[in-house]
């Protein structure tokens, strides 16, 4: 048994892009509120100058803050992103030193203190993202 990602002869995923999305579902009725392709092939081994694709394969989950921000890395392009929970608009992204195929966490040192979002940037061998061994913290404004 092999646990590998199946690629086409062009070394791309077999299904058409986008290959990964961040989707918000209204749990009261099951409808999709918004669906945004997650990541870009521009800085990955999938890059093709003739066709930059939004929505890379991804592995990792989001966190949601009380202020309505959705933080997720997961994509193959080594960015941690923040999205608006109501609209799906990408509000911010920060470059990671390696793949962020992990679920971020958030914390405060004091109840009235600054909030931080932290993610392990270790990469993922099967996805072909850059490997590393960093913990990266971003302070929320």
Predicted regions and their residues:
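A fold-level detector for beta-propeller and closely related beta-sheet-rich head/sensor domains
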Residues: 1-141
């Amino acid at each position: 048994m092999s646990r590998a990602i199946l690629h086409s002869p062009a070394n791309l995923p077999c299904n058409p892009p986008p290959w990964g999305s961040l989707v918000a579902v209204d749990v009261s009725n099951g409808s999709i509120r918004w669906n945004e392709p997650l990541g870009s092939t521009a800085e990955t081994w999938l890059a093709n100058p003739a066709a930059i694709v939004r929505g890379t394969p991804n592995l990792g989950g989001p966190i949601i803050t009380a202020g309505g921000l959705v933080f997720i890395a997961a994509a193959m392009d080594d960015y941690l992103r923040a999205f608006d929970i109501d609209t799906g608009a990408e509000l911010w992204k920060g470059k990671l030193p390696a793949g962020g195929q992990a679920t971020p966490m958030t914390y405060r040192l004091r109840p009235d203190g600054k909030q931080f979002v932290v993610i392990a940037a270790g990469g993922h061998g099967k996805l072909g993202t850059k490997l590393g061994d960093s913990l990266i913290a971003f302070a929320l404004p």
